[in-house]
Amino acid sequence: NRAAVVHVLKQQAGTPTRVGFAAGRRLGKAVVRNRVKRRLREAVRLLWPRVRQGYYIVVIARQAALDMPFPELRQKVEELFERAGLMQREG
């Protein structure tokens, strides 16, 4: 995915899911890196009720996330989480 990379580590059942965010220095200065992490954090917050429990997740920002409109970024993060098997089935 152009916006981000997701690394997942499965934990014991009943462990709450924890999420970390990273943005490398090649993305820009601290203000830019912090902004992209805030946007990714908000995208994950909107998905949180549907995220499975029992995982450690690291979301690493990529260059394309800097200029991407937020609705598109949120959709890309949701696609990543679904591909990684982190989303609960709706219904």
What spans do the regions from the language model cover?
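Positively charged, solvent-exposed patches that mediate nucleic-acid binding
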Residues: 1-91
